[in-house]
Regions:
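Non-catalytic, mostly N-terminal accessory regions of nucleic-acid modification and defense proteins
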Residues: 1-233, 312-336, 341
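SAM-dependent methyltransferase catalytic region
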Residues: 193, 197-384
Length: 384
């Protein structure tokens, strides 16, 4: 995916380690592509303002676009295996080696499909992304800065083939599958970082902290911690050893939630607690858990998005299993925060100081805030 996205950017005149082609010199772009080029430039400039050098900003953008599409496809595979959506990825012989949705689309749009290299799959995927984004914007928002570039048909088909053939359906049913993919994706960057550790001037930059410090906690550790914290609190409440509370008043927060392994396990525990309490129906409980009980923070935006995604899938799974409507549009309330920020720097910071140059109090406040948040991507939720 990354090599493919890099080539797509080259088609837009954007290079790594080479000057960019001026937009007015790109005569072959359509009006839509010209707008895409402008939006891609803005996204890369935003990364530069966050501290990346220009070439590294381009590389980071490529990585984020690739990661976005990989996770979208993985999420679709999880949902189709769980029966939450009709199959759109996996091809079946009975559907003419197309997916169920693909075959239905082909029946009504044969001419369109014939002229598309992927048989219309890319078009279908965008429709599905837009539909899911109506329920959860995280990761599926087709108007975000990482959606202006679309992988080639060949690349998409290759990734889909790998997801459908190299990972069995039972594995896709596991709650941890999204976290495993997240860990694998970051393990490559982590390995690259530690190959430099014997260098004399080796150091880990703030931008490398998320990938370097992430550890996927084994199930038995997660279960042990949840059993000796959340489960213990509830048990003590039931046995009169602790003041009794309604389940919706019990809060659990993971200040470095990663891809949500602890929160997913806590979700199951809270669900059983609500069922035992008996105040709400099984159609209400999933929403109550997200609204009242589960909270997560991380310095990695992608980790936060993936946590939101798996909690979204978890909610739809519980609703489906108990015979309730799985359309969550307008009903989800997810308490997740990315403890990250892009500080003003360069000219923008100087303009702010100039604006308040006659107010020493405000200037001092700007100085203090800037110092506190200078390493926000490192400190995360430790900042008070």
């Amino acid at each position: 995916l990354e090599k493919d996205i890099e080539q797509v950017l080259i088609n837009y005149g954007i290079y790594i380690n080479k000057g960019w082609v001026n937009l007015r010199d790109l005569k072959n772009l359509t009006e839509e592509q010209e707008n895409n080029r402008k939006n891609i430039e803005k996204a890369i400039e935003k990364l530069e303002k966050g501290g990346f050098e220009k070439d590294k900003a381009v590389m980071e953008y490529i990585k984020e676009v690739s990661y976005t599409y990989l996770n979208r496809l993985a999420a679709l595979r999880v949902m189709e295996v769980r029966g939450l959506i009709d199959e759109i990825l996996v091809p079946r012989g009975e559907h003419g080696n197309r997916s169920f949705i693909g075959s239905r689309f082909y029946e009504v749009a044969r001419e369109f499909c014939k002229y598309e290299m992927d048989g219309g799959l890319g078009y279908l995927l965008n429709i599905m992304f837009e539909e899911i984004s109506e329920e959860i914007k995280m990761l599926f928002n087709t108007e975000d800065e990482y959606s202006f570039v679309t992988p080639s048909s060949a690349s998409l088909l290759k990734v889909i083939e790998l997801l459908c053939t190299n990972i069995d359906e039972e594995t896709w049913r596991q709650d941890e599958i999204i976290g495993w993919i997240y860990q694998y994706f970051n393990s490559i960057e982590k390995s690259e970082i530690f190959t430099r550790q014997n260098q004399k001037d080796f150091f880990i930059s703030v931008d490398e902290v998320p990938a370097t410090t992430q550890i996927f906690t084994p199930d038995w550790v997660v279960n042990w911690i949840i059993d000796n914290s959340l489960n213990k609190v509830y048990s003590e409440m039931k046995n009169g050893l602790r003041g009794k509370k309604n389940v919706e008043d019990i809060k659990l927060i993971d200040p470095c939630c990663g891809s949500g392994h602890f929160l997913v396990r806590a979700y199951d525990v809270f669900y059983e607690m609500y069922v035992e309490e008996g105040k709400y129906t099984k159609g209400e409980i999933p929403y109550k858990i997200l609204e009242n009980n589960i909270h997560g923070i991380d310095i990695d935006l992608r980790a936060v998005q993936l946590t939101g995604l798996i909690l979204f899938i978890k909610t739809k799974t519980y609703l489906k299993e108990n015979g309730y409507d799985t359309n969550t549009q307008g009903k989800l309330s997810v308490n997740l925060v990315c403890a990250d920020a892009i500080l003003l720097n360069g000219r923008r910071l100087e303009d702010l100081k100039e604006k308040h140059k006659d107010n020493k109090t405000i200037l001092k406040m700007i100085e203090i805030i800037y110092e506190e948040f200078e390493d926000v991507r490192l400190k995360g939720s430790l900042i008070q």
